[in-house]
């Protein structure tokens, strides 16, 4: 489903908490970039949409990678917590920041254990009138080695 002519496309932020994710961040970025570009091309979301990485006090090079990705790729941005505060607090920090910029916010784990193709269905449900869309995975049969 795309927006009708004359209606403003909505800004999507995908909030991705990150803790010591340097091993997976490059692949995560590649896949999320591809998904976001597809959604923009299909006129499901605004060009102002972003993926927001939230560094949760990582001890490895995660924050450095987020900074480099954000400099190279317009679709990506990042924030860094002063120290490790835990997944839920990193998620909350990202959501609280994203709400200032986005019409739609989706959370996703950095290891891509969530199916990024579900984003399309979630956005469709939003445009159908849902205020909240919640996804629960029923099986892990399709997981690649990268996600396990």
Regions found by a protein language model. Name each.
Residues 3-144:
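Structured catalytic core of nucleotide-sugar glycosyltransferases
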């Amino acid at each position: 489903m795309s927006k009708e002519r004359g209606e403003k496309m909505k800004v999507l932020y995908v909030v991705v908490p990150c803790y010591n994710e340097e091993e997976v961040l490059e692949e995560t970025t590649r896949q999320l970039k591809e998904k976001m570009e597809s959604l923009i091309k299909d006129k499901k979301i605004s060009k102002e949409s972003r993926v927001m990485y939230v560094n949760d006090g990582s001890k490895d090079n995660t924050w450095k990678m987020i900074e480099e990705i954000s400099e190279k790729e317009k679709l990506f941005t990042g924030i860094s917590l002063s120290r490790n505060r835990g997944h839920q607090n990193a998620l909350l920090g990202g959501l609280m920041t994203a709400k200032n910029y986005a019409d739609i916010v989706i959370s996703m784990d950095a290891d891509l254990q969530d199916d990024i193709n579900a984003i399309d269905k979630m956005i469709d449900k939003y445009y159908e009138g849902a205020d909240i869309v919640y996804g629960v995975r029923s099986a892990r049969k399709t997981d690649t080695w990268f996600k396990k």
